[in-house]
Amino acid sequence: TNWSWQNATAVMFLNEAAKKANSTDGKKLAEVLTGLTIKCPFGADGTVTMRADDRTLVGYAIGWGTTIPQEPYVLDMKAGDWKTIFELEAEWKKSKGYT
């Protein structure tokens, strides 16, 4: 499920931020976390980023396919493309007047 990799990633972010801030102070951690990119096994390219403008996690592996109840469990897996996701997000924000 999503919560397991998301929580593991959150711990990785906090660990890296504490190292960079040399502190566990919440305000210092928040400053370091903003825009931070870390190495992560769940990243599409081996990294994930805490986007600076809205603190959204981006760059994680995403994909889809047909699920089945036996191995390989997912047929015709297609990897998501973050370039396309960012383009669609920008179009949506513009259509809603957010940009």
Feature annotation, model-predicted:
Residues T1-T99:
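Extracytosolic ligand-binding ectodomains
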